Amino acid sequence: MMNYMDLLLTQAGKLPQKVFLVTETKRLTYEAVCDAALSYAALLQSLSCPKGTLLIVRKDPVAQLTAFLGAQKAGFVPILGHPDLTPLLAETLSKKRGIAYIDDGQFRVGQSGSMVPQGAIMGVLSSGSTDLPKLLFRTYESWADFFPEQCRIFGLKRDSVAFTEGSMSFTGNLSVFASVLYAGASLVMGEGLYPKRWETLLYREGVTYLYLVPVKLKLFLRIIRHPFLSVTTVMAGSQ
């Protein structure tokens, strides 16, 4: 059963030294991201616990993604939680949604019971703010089958540089990451609501593909001082 760690292993074999993930302070190649994910997978495997759903809570987007990928390699079904999820809320979410394990810096047993659909390789949490997030499952094919057409329509290819801002627990950002991985492209990730710093990152990295939710895109458009000649695609979508 194919998953995104399998895809990363393939891309890292083809493009080991190509820059994959970028933040203000980090530049990681495909090989480096793969190595970090394999290290996390080895840590999970050393625990010798039954496989199941795993709620992952990290503040840093690179750490979110390497744990997400490593969990898949280790045979778990990863679920990225919001970075501000407190231990108490994580445990409540685990109990209400039947998530088997929690790793928010401390790995611990959660609440078993959630039935994982056949073929599911990850869980995603709904972004509704009125209640506890719902847990939805995704197969690899549910996204990956659309990547060839998405990449064609939006011009996402190996030399593309995409930009997102915010947590990878948001489905929109995670989907962009997955598309970038499929294309063998690069992903620049802004951290925090600092549009002037996003502007610096876009110029510095020569971003070609911009993805922001509408409210953040409007905020960004208010502060930009120069045209971005490198940007060919702008996407405004939901998180």
Model segments located where?
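Flexible, low-complexity linker/hinge segments
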Residues: 102-120, 137, 145-147, 153
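Conserved AMP-binding/adenylate-forming
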Residues: 26, 42-84, 165-167
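Adenylate-forming
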Residues: 193, 207-239
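ATP-dependent adenylate-forming carboxylate-activation enzymes
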Residues: 58-59, 79-93, 185-205, 214-216
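Conserved AMP-binding/adenylation subdomain of ANL enzymes
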Residues: 144-161, 169-209
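Conserved AMP-binding A3 loop
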Residues: 29-30, 120-148
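Conserved AMP-binding/adenylate-forming core of the ANL superfamily
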Residues: 9, 17-48, 90-91, 104, ...
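A short N-terminal helical cap/helix-turn-helix that marks the beginning
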Residues: 1-19, 118-121
